[in-house]
Amino acid sequence: MNAHVEQLEFQAEARQLLDLMVHSVYSNKDAFLRELISNASDALDKLRIEALRNKDLEVDTSDLHIEIDADKAARTLTVRDNGIGMAREEVVDLIGTLAKSGTAELRAQLREAKNAAASEELIGQFGIGFYSSFMVADKVQLLTRKAGESAATRWESSGEGTYTIESVEDAPQGTSVTLHLKPEDAEDDLHDYTSEWKIRNLVKKYSDFIAWPIRMDVERRTPASQEEGGEGGEETVTIETETLNSMKALWARPKEEVSEQEYKEFYKHVAHAWDDPLEIIAMKAEGTFEYQALLFIPSHAPFDLFDRDAHVGIQLYVKRVFIMGDCDQLMPEYLRFVKGVVDAQDMSLNVSREILQQDRQIKAIRRRLTKKVLSTIKDVQSSRPEDYRTFWTQFGRVLKEGLLSDIDNRETLLGISSFVSTYSEEEPTTLAEYVERMKDGQQQIFYATGETRQQLLKSPHLEAFKAKGYEVLLLTDPVDEVWVGMVPEFDGKPLQSVAKGEVDLSSEEDTSEAEREERQKEFADLLTWLQETLSDHVKEVRLSTRLTESPACLITDAFGMTPALARIYRASGQEVPVGKRILELNPSHPLVTGLRQAHQDRADDAEKSLAETAELLYGTALLAEGGALEDPARFAELLAERLARTL
């Protein structure tokens, strides 16, 4: 007996996505069937694993399969599985709402998408393929019963902002999705999805490799023979159940037997993507540890790339039997964008994540896969620079995380990394290219860290470097602040921050040693006085060799923590001791020479005014590097007073 039918509203984000689907402008509406079959395959995988691990679950897993049922008269198409099924709350959570992070970002990106293809890619990235049913259907019905439970749930919607849900009895285990198809419309790319030929074609194109049988009842018409019915005899109609897919594990087939299109469709299945991969990696290892792997480097970064709880994307099989998805032990975290499958030969079928953490074979496979992925990226870098630039734009930030965690592959990672520099506004540079361009006598690789390229180019710290033609790497990702402190050198060249430690770019052509010593004596009194006056803010005041235009700048000790790095640590909840920095002065700047003269000629009542000038000098140095003033109101007050005196 059916329970009361409840009508509910879709979550706001879901309503907007439904509207996109119902009034779809997407060119590839055929992909809805791939999404439904992929969901059914996932449900079968989950049931098999659950039955293996939960001995109390009484289910029959001897004939797990997917069925497709097309009814031409009713214009319906049903995709049915006998997999894990869903409970009522799961239906509401997974379909009635979008219980995912990033929905606001998805809406924004969809609005900005330039064309249908871009929108399709975004929908795929956000993992909401079920909604694609509304591209071809006026109404969608879902019936599901979770394995081990008696009650089932029926869900129905026309995609107009509401849906109905009710509890039912006597439903088979698993899930069936029935689409009430829209009329055929060639102009809108709506085909006859009840056509046996069309269904066969789509399954072959998108889902031939699915590990579970995809079955469909088909009619077979046999003309009556002369002996049986003569000319007036009727043809015989029989119904046969056929398996539409080959179920061949793509990774187990020789590479020369697999077409590029088959690889692409398999990628879309395992990655839940709508676009093509940037690179395909097929490998087979024999010997102590035997395994096969089929990996993909995506073309676009997923929206949750920097979500630590996001899925890794590597599926683990043992002898072609699915064991688990998102096996994070098979790939380091900084390669979490890699998708694909690994099929091991010598491993228990009931392996758990806890066992995997200690498994020697898994660790060996992980090392080999990591090296293979990195070497593939290096090959792309050298042979297909445009594809490499695409890759680096999408995944460079996350790849640099490996410079912190993967010491064994650090040199390789440094080699395949690219950085913006002062050499070119448009083309990033590798460290090897930087080293090739180093000036005669240059021993260090110079870099600057900050929030944006524009901010760094205007930084006082770069003035002398630009004036003398030294190239400086401009590092603007938060991870850059961390890894530069852990990577001492590249190709024997130390990495040197332009804002840390002592940097002397002067030469005998600029000033002699005697001239520098004389200048130091001239400013000695001012430096001592400034250090006392600004002792609450700085640990030292000294003359600079890195300034040519600005009056002053703030730097950090060679092994000190930059303000940006301190902010990163504080944001992560770590205690960071407050450290004072060093104030460097440009001895050639009129403000500094004027301050020296004023300090030298000061009267007794001028001390306060000079101290305020020193405070303003410190504040301008802080602002020039993009820092935040400790007391903005006081700075504004002092500045207003000085400006008033000039009028």
From Swiss-Prot:
This is Chaperone protein HtpG. Molecular chaperone. Has ATPase activity. Belongs to the heat shock protein 90 family. The gene is htpG. Residues 568-647 are annotated as: C. CDD domains: HATPase_Hsp90-like (cd16927). Residues 1-353 are annotated as: A. It holds the Pfam family HATPase_c_3. Homodimer. InterPro entries: HATPase_C_sf, Heat_shock_protein_90_CS, HSP90_C, Hsp90_fam, Hsp90_N, Ribosomal_Su5_D2-typ_SF. GO terms for biological process: cellular response to superoxide; DNA damage response; protein folding; response to heat. NCBIfam families: PRK05218.1.
